[in-house]
From Swiss-Prot:
It comes from Pseudomonas aeruginosa (strain ATCC 15692 / DSM 22644 / CIP 104116 / JCM 14847 / LMG 12228 / 1C / PRS 101 / PAO1). To E.coli YfeH. PANTHER family: SODIUM_BILE ACID COTRANSPORTER 7 (PTHR18640:SF5), SOLUTE CARRIER FAMILY 10 MEMBER 7 (PTHR18640). It holds the Pfam family SBF_like. This is Uncharacterized protein PA2026.
């Protein structure tokens, strides 16, 4: 029997297990140095494979729909940061100051690629446009996220020079991605054939970052500084932000006259945030001991968005099926 879509997937369970492992068996000293090196190699490999998997033809096919892309990018890089700032009076009492900074970091991140496309496809939306929007959003994030982080968190003294951050992210994330794109001509078919196996490389890289980040944070006293009540407040905060993002993207898509297929793409690409990009970026942008609290809101938001968007995608798909069935029956009446 298949697992209901609203239950956590295996990767989410692995994330939880990794956090627990870091809590009870954190790496430190020379072991932490070794893990740091392995993690850096894993991140480079992760983005190399992302570049090798991404079809240039699919991006070009979706590029002509510039109004849709502009709206998605505006939702990702303008609407979300404004929500994070506007909700500060409501969110700050619910979470610790460190977790609120993590929420602001979440709001500055690009859209996720794989799940945005998967949910758009499931809901019968404009898949080529989703591929283009989500992929370009991820690339824009290399440059825009450090600038947004500096603007949103700079006053708190949590970030360094934004240009230095862009340089580090370009070297660690964008260069491997471009290398993967360049070599796609020769290795693309092999990557496509081995997608199920290579998925473990993706997930393993993220788990490595989470383990090293939470190990450092635990050693610095993370769980003594984050009470359970703040974690409950963080859950509520993530639900509120996602709900507002879904409502606003839906309303904007309808008010601006987009088709139902385009609305689906805007909703799923404009309301999601990338764990695969966010965790490595946090490692570059923040001190190792600060990464844990920074990515905790993102990890929680990631699971909530998967559960909610799975249900929403199924509702969209059912409506499309019902409409098609009604249209097919119409001539016989």
């Amino acid at each position: 029997m298949s697992r209901p879509r609203f239950l956590p997937d295996n990767f989410t369970l692995a994330l939880i297990a990794t956090v627990l492992l870091a809590t009870f068996l954190p790496c430190s000293g020379q072991t932490a140095v070794v893990f740091e090196w392995v993690t850096n190699i894993g991140i480079g490999l992760l983005f190399f494979l992302h570049g090798a998997k991404l079809s240039r033809q699919a991006i070009i096919a979706g590029m002509t729909h510039w109004r849709l892309h502009l709206l998605v990018f505006a939702c990702t890089f303008v609407m979300f940061p404004l929500l994070g700032l506007a909700l500060k009076p409501a969110l700050s009492p619910m979470v610790t100051p460190e977790l609120y900074l993590g929420i602001l970091f979440l709001c500055a991140l690009p859209a996720t690629v794989q799940s945005s496309i998967a949910f758009t496809s499931l809901a019968r939306g404009n898949v080529p446009a989703a591929v283009c929007s989500a992929s370009v959003s991820s690339l824009l994030g290399v440059f825009l996220t450090p600038l947004l982080v500096k603007l949103l968190l700079g006053a708190e003294g949590e970030t360094g020079n934004a240009l230095d951050a862009i340089g580090k992210i370009t070297l660690q994330l964008l260069v491997p991605f471009i290398a993967g794109q360049v070599l796609r001509r020769w290795i693309g078919a092999w990557v496509e054939r081995n997608k199920p196996v290579l998925r473990y490389v993706d997930q393993g890289s993220i788990l490595l970052v989470v383990y090293t980040a939470f190990s450092a944070a635990v050693i610095q006293g993370l769980w003594h500084e984050v009470p359970w009540l703040a974690l409950l407040g963080l859950t509520v905060a993530c639900c509120v932000i996602l709900a507002l993002a879904l409502v606003l993207t839906t309303v904007l898509a309808r008010r601006l006259g987009f088709s139902k297929e385009d609305e689906i793409t805007i909703v799923f690409c404009g309301s999601k945030k990338s764990l695969a990009t966010g965790v490595p970026m946090a490692k570059v942008l923040f001190a190792t001991s600060a990464v844990g609290p920074m990515v905790l809101p993102l990890m929680l938001f990631h699971q909530i968005q998967l559960m909610v968007c799975a249900v929403l995608a199924q509702r969209y798909a059912r409506r499309r099926d019902d409409a098609a069935a009604a249209l097919a029956e119409a001539p016989s009446r």
